[in-house]
């Protein structure tokens, strides 16, 4: 398992250990054997993926001559060192996928509305390296993806990289969904994703818009007509009875 800088165990397994990586790769291999055409890793949970386990600390000491347990979590050397273990796992997943042609790797990442690279500084996901080595096919960023970061990744990955930002918050008006989709498309997104999609359609008008967001030519119309989707009207009577004071318990 992972360990804090005081040596206290953490419940999550550490990718610093080859045996742990092989365990996860074994599960992924079993999944692929059912005929799936790819793998998606949710890297916005249980991050970062190594902490202060013995091999991590020893390798850092050998490289920098310093104990990382006394450093800030934001120390650039520590972030780079920690990220290297996850990158190694991503390489191994890519190698597994490439045993057969046309299998894709998607990753879900954490993003910040203010453009701060939380995926790297906090979660130690070295996305630039993954793109540069051609390891990933899909980037799905939640809850927000700043336009500048989207454009940066697009410049690194070109058209072959799929970048699908999440549409947050979960509950929005139809017009709000369409405006957000337009903003991401203009920045270079080629698709969109919905984290917790099964909990998104609190109102039928939302789904009436969301189901069309992949059709860019419809977005202006959604913005214009969205406020009129499935309007509700308050009933004053039902079956001849006053609704306000009827149909109560007892």
Language-model-derived ranges and their functions:
Residues 1-14, 47-84, 224:
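Aromatic- and acidic-residue-enriched carbohydrate-binding clefts of CAZyme catalytic domains
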Residues 1-34:
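Active-site-adjacent "subsite" loops/lids of carbohydrate-active enzymes
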Residues 24, 31, 39-42, 93, ...:
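Conserved, mostly hydrophobic/aromatic
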Residues 28, 40-47, 75-121, 160-170:
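Aromatic-lined carbohydrate-recognition surfaces of secreted/lumenal glycan-active proteins
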Residues 28-29, 83-94, 127-128, 150-154, ...:
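Generic structural signal for well-ordered alpha-helices
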Residues 34-39, 100-106, 134-138, 158-163, ...:
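Loop/turn elements at helix/coil->beta-strand transitions in domains of secreted/extracellular proteins
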Residues 99, 103-149, 172-173, 180-181:
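Substrate-binding cleft/loops of secretory-pathway carbohydrate-active enzymes
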Residues 135-149, 168-240:
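Substrate-binding cleft of secreted/luminal carbohydrate-active enzymes
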């Amino acid at each position: 398992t992972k360990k804090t800088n005081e040596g206290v165990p953490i419940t999550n397994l550490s990718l610093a250990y080859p045996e742990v990586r092989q365990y996860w790769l074994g599960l992924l291999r079993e999944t692929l054997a059912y005929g799936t055409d790819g793998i998606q890793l949710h890297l916005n949970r249980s991050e970062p993926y190594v902490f202060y386990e013995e091999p991590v600390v020893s390798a850092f000491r050998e490289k920098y001559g310093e104990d990382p347990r006394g450093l800030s979590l934001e120390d650039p050397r520590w972030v780079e060192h920690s990220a290297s273990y996850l990158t190694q796992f991503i390489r191994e997943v890519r190698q597994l996928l490439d045993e057969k042609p046309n299998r894709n790797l998607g990753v879900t990442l954490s993003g910040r509305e203010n453009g701060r690279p939380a995926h790297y500084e906090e979660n130690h996901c070295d996305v630039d390296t993954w793109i540069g080595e051609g390891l990933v096919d899909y980037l799905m960023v939640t809850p927000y993806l700043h336009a500048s970061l989207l454009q940066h990744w697009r410049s690194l990955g070109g058209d072959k990289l799929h970048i699908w930002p999440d549409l947050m918050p979960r509950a929005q008006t139809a017009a709000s969904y369409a405006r957000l989709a337009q903003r991401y498309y203009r920045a270079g997104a080629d698709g969109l994703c919905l984290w917790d999609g099964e909990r998104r359609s609190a109102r039928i008008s939302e789904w009436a818009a969301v189901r069309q967001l992949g059709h860019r030519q419809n977005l202006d119309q959604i913005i214009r007509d969205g406020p009129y989707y499935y309007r509700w009207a308050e009933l004053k009577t039902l079956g001849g009875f006053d609704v306000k004071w009827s149909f109560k318990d007892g």
